[in-house]
Amino acid sequence: MSNRILRSCVALATLLLLLASGCSRKSDSARNTVQIKGSDTMVNLSQAWAEQFMKTHPGTSIAVTGGGSGNGITSLISSTCDIAEVSREMKESEIALARQKGVEPTKNIVALDGLAVAINAANPVNQLTIAQLADIFTGKVKNWKELCGREGRIVLLSREVNSGTHVYFKEHVLRHGNAEAKDEFSPEALLLPSSQAIVDEVTQNTDAIGYFGMGYITPRLKVVKIAVDDKSPAYAPAIELIQKNIYPISRPLIMYTKGAPAGLTKTFMEFIRSPEGQEVVRKMDFVPVP
C-alpha cells in the first residue's frame, strides 16, 4: 500500500515538473515575440519593419495583424497585443477605458503620412479644396458636372468606421478640425474593408473618388491636388511637404504601447526610430520622422 502511494507521489511530482517546464518554455517563447495589431494603412510598413528586424535578431518573432486602428486599440486595452498601430490619436474615452483595465497607453510616433485623394485616371478634375472635399463626401455635391462639367454621379469610397483613416478624414476634412461639428459621411458612401480595395475600385470606376495613405498611391489612378481654400496653392502629397506640414491632409502614424516599451518591444521600437528603420519608412513610400 505504502509503495503504491509512493509511486503515485513520484508520478505526480514528475507531472508537475513537466508542466512547470512547459510553462517555462512558453514564458521564454513569449519574451521572444511581439504582437502588433491595428491600422490597415500601417500593416505593410510594420511587416517590412518586422522582416528587417528578424533578419538581425534571429530567434525573435514580430507578428503583425491588420483589421483597423480601432481593432488595435481594443486589443491593447484587452492586453491581447503588445503594440497597437494606429493612424489616428486615441480618443479620451479609449484612454480612460484602458486605464480602468490597468493599461497606460504610451504614444510613439513612428512615421508620417499624407492622405491621398484619388480619382480615376480618365476624370478631368485636377484639384479640390478642403471645402469641396467635405461637400463631396457629405453628399452635398453629387455629380461631377458641379465640379468639372462632366456628367457622372459621384461614387464615394470610404474606409470602414473602425479605421483610423476613416476617423481622421472625418475629423479633419468633413468637420474641418472642429471638435464640435457633427458632419458625417453621406449614407451613400461605400465602406470598403481596406485601402487596397479603394485603390482597386477607383482604378476601375470612372466616377469614383476615395482616400488612403500615400503608401498606396499607384500610377493607375490620378491623385488630386488639395488646397486649404480657393485662395491657397494646391499640393499633392510629397515627403518634404508633409515633413513641413504644408500638405493639408497630413498626420502622424503612431504605435501605442502598454506603458514605456520594455524588453523586446523596446528593442523593436528603437530599431523603428533608427536610421535603418526610417529608411524602411522611405522605401515603403511613407514619410520618415524628422
Regions from the PLM with identified roles:
Residues M1-T33:
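Short, low-complexity disordered leader/linker segments with a strong preference
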Residues C23-P290:
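Exported/periplasmic ABC-transporter solute-binding proteins
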